[in-house]
Amino acid sequence: MKITLVGSRYFGATAFDAICKEGIAVARVVVPAADDRLAQVAQAGGVKVVVLDDPNNVPASAIAEGSEIIVAAHSHARVSTEALARARFGGIGYHPSLLPRHRGIAAVEWTVREGDPIAGGTVYHLAERMDAGAIAAQDWCFVRKGESARDLWERALAPMGFRLLVEVLRDVKATGILPAKPQDEAFATRAPMIPAPANAPAR
């Protein structure tokens, strides 16, 4: 099975390694910047890297010919409808919440802010609306008392994401089927960016 990986930074680079170890061919990597960590890892592995002209949009031309699936791993770029049409199964991404809860860029922060006792992660189909595509796989974990968003991400949700992405790809490779369970809109919530406090020190 051949995929195109769209992503960035630590999560994208680690997902790349996990997918390659599974024996799945990464035909192309798409990144927002040439010096991105994912770009460096892909180039070291001999994989072609495409740097987006517009870091907010993935055009069809960025997707490798013959890709069966597009995988988004920490990508803030929207994968266009035309790009999704280039892959047999379209695209999937990982979101660190139990979708449809906490749709948005700050899902882990809102999980902690709202005092959720349970968190989770979802592999979902990329779609026109952000984080609203059908669910391919989910798992959950408890949130520890006093745990920060960063701690929760590093302890549980990032490792969960790598595992779920690999499990979904492994199953698609074996069965030719990508599960698609529609999200229940009755339970949808938003997780927009949380502004830093006005008196927060500069970094």
Give a label for each model feature.
Residues 69-192:
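Donor/substrate-binding cores of folate-linked one-carbon enzymes
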Residues 31-56:
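Conserved nucleotide-sugar phosphate-binding/catalytic loop shared by glycosyltransferases and other
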Residues 1-33:
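N-terminal Rossmann-like dinucleotide-binding module
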Residues 37-40, 60-61, 101-108:
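Short, charged, surface-exposed secondary-structure boundary motifs
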Residues 6-9, 32-33, 53, 73-74, ...:
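Structural motif
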Residues 26, 48-51, 90-91, 119:
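Hydrophobic beta-strand scaffold residues
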Residues 194-203:
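Acyl-group handling in specialized metabolite and lipid biosynthesis
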Residues 56-66:
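Short amphipathic alpha-helix with an adjacent loop that forms part of the alpha/beta core around
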